[in-house]
Every structure is written in C-alpha cells, then in structure tokens.
Amino acid sequence: MKLAAMIKKMCPSDSELSIPAKNCYRMVILGSSKVGKTAIVSRFLTGRFEDAYTPTIEDFHRKFYSIRGEVYQLDILDTSGNHPFPAMRRLSILTGDVFILVFSLDNRDSFEEVQRLKQQILDTKSCLKNKTKENVDVPLVICGNKGDRDFYREVEQREIEQLVGDDPQRCAYFEISAKKNSSLDQMFRALFAMAKLPSEMSPDLHRKVSVQYCDVLHKKALRNKKLLRAGSGGGGDHGDAFGILAPFARRPSVHSDLMYIREKTSVGSQAKDKERCVIS
C-alpha cells in the first residue's frame, strides 16, 4: 500500500493530466487462445517477450504520450481468447478505436476465429454508423503470428488476401513473430497511420520515460506547443516524443464504457477540447 501511495504521489492522476477527449483512444487485441496476443502487448509496452504461457482473462493497460505539444492517452485491452462473456466482448468492440486481430500461422481454427471477429467488429460498429448517420471507419490490422517457427502452414496466402481485402487504408496484414520481434514496429506504424494517430505512438519512435518523471508530460507538451506556435519546429522530431506506462491502470467500469458509447452515438456529438476523458 505504501508503494502504491508513493507512485500515486509521483504520477498525477488521469484527471490531473486533463487530457482532451479527442486525444484519448483504445486499442483492442482480439484472437483465439495461445496465438500470442499478450506477447504482442508485452512487446508494445516493454519491448520484452515472455516465453511462459499464462491464460488471459482480460488485461488492461494505459499509456500516456507527449507528442508535438499534445498529450495523448492510449488504453490497451488484451482480451481473453475464450470469450466466456459475449456481452463484454461486444462492449470491448464498441469502445475500441483501433483493433489488432491475431491468429497463429500453424492453426487454421485461429484463422477462422479471426474471420468471425472481423465480421463481428464490422457488424457491431455498423450500429454506431446507423445511429450517427456518419461513416465509421475501423482501423484494423490482422497479424499472422509465430512466423519464426518451421511448420506446415494451415492457412493459404490467398485466403488471407481475401480476408484483408484490397483497401490498405481500412485493413492491413502483417506476418509477424512476437518472439523474434519481427515486423511488429511496421505493424504498429501502419495501424496508427490508418487511424490518423501520431506515428510516434509506435514503440520505436518515442523515448520511454520512468513513472517518477510523469510530471514532465505537460511541461514538455506546453514547451513544444509554444515552440510550434513560434514557428521554430519544436517537437517535430521523434526525439521530442516520449511515453509513460501508467502503473496500476484499471479498466474503466461498465458504466463508464456505456457512457462513452452513448457519447459516441449521440447525433452530432463530437469530442471537444474542453471535454475530458471519462474516469472510472
């Protein structure tokens, strides 16, 4: 408890950071069990790979960024491959802004699950489209993981291409290896570009800052914003982008998620700079 209090004192709360709603996003990782979802998340957050397998029920992470004079919040939701609660999966999809669908190249069942997941995402998001009367783009990448193994492939390239489609701005495919850290950076860059988010959110394009320096988020952002307004180009390179992994991040409550969805589905409702992220 003392450790938690110390870290809380060192790092401002989400409300103290005052991040505009337009700068808050959620990345959702979906797929069957044992395909490497958690390994991909671990690479994204820490750069490390854990070989031991531990079944995931649902893991929630939060990361803050200071990029080009702006502060961003990215929530990362690592979902269960067993989906014991369909309603929770639907809620995760409704609140997601960008998606990573993962299958194992040596497991056809996991590929067929990704086929179902992609359709479920499109169907679920179409509800928002029908209510808002606006186009709802769904930035989505499909990952064929475990490309480092010498195995017999159970999925043909033709099937993958058919699933992905011919519009790289809506869906892209990457053959990756979380174990070897192969093609992951390219995948994250493509996903953030698809979502029109700063490329510096990719783990290879920003500096990672320890939690005790959390207070520099706004100081650095304000400094860069002043430089940008002055036309000096401050904050324009990746050296001025950095991110902090929030300790003890908690998944927002169901009520908070439902309020967030309600806000998104309200006709003409758009995130404004004065609006703040929903804090559970």
Curated annotation (Swiss-Prot):
The lineage of its organism: Eukaryota, Metazoa, Chordata, Craniata, Vertebrata. GO terms for biological process: negative regulation of DNA-templated transcription; nitric oxide mediated signal transduction. A lipid is attached at residue 277 (S-farnesyl cysteine). InterPro entries: P-loop_NTPase, Small_GTP-bd, Small_GTPase, Small_GTPase_RasD. A motif (Effector region) lies at residues 53-61. The modification S-nitrosocysteine is found at residue 11. Induction: By dexamethasone. Small GTPase. Negatively regulates the transcription regulation activity of the APBB1/FE65-APP complex via its interaction with APBB1/FE65. Component of a complex, at least composed of APBB1, RASD1/DEXRAS1 and APP. Interacts with APBB1/FE65. Forms a ternary complex with CAPON and NOS1. It comes from Mus musculus. S-nitrosylation stimulates guanine-nucleotide exchange activity. This is Dexamethasone-induced Ras-related protein 1. GO terms for molecular function: GTP binding; GTPase activity. Residues 278-280 form a propeptide.
